[in-house]
């Protein structure tokens, strides 16, 4: 019975501290959010970052060790080269309260995104960690009765999410057809070396792009 009553008591204690704006609770939540944020970044890495180098390894354009090193460097560099996606996620999706309840909201959103990343990784489902985080933020905001910027979600999340596969299909088809026509009379052996180099460059660009997001 005592253990059964412990959890509700803990929840009530956290709620009271949040309502009072307890500095100790605020510091604790900030530290927890940093830790949970790093865990989310880790799941984001093993969930999405490997996609950029998978084909380079499978075609033997790169060895696994070199490909992993390149992915680490390009993703790390990309994180410092752009902040537009971070700005969108930080302020364009929801209006989080500027108190302890806002910190709780962010932590719950991160935990939800981590759970989805782990589940989809376990099931082998190709999903986006960015969209998982946005979904976590919206869900946590709705539960907390916080502001959700629906126009921003439609313009910056839903429309790009729907258009990106279509644009990818069109560009992929066009580029592949152009490459096949351009090199239709080329000798296979030197062409293979060039394509492996091009694949390495494209994998590095994908890693950089993933880091930017």
From Swiss-Prot:
Membrane topology of this protein: Multi-pass membrane protein
Recorded catalytic activity of this chain's protein: phosphate(in) + H(+)(in) = phosphate(out) + H(+)(out)
Transmembrane region(s): 23-43, 66-86, 102-122, 134-154, 161-181
PANTHER family per UniProt: PHOSPHATE TRANSPORTER
Function: Low-affinity inorganic phosphate transporter.
Family: Belongs to the inorganic phosphate transporter (PiT) (TC 2.A.20) family. Pit subfamily.
Protein name according to UniProt: Probable low-affinity inorganic phosphate transporter
Originating species: Streptomyces halstedii
Gene symbol of the encoding locus: pit
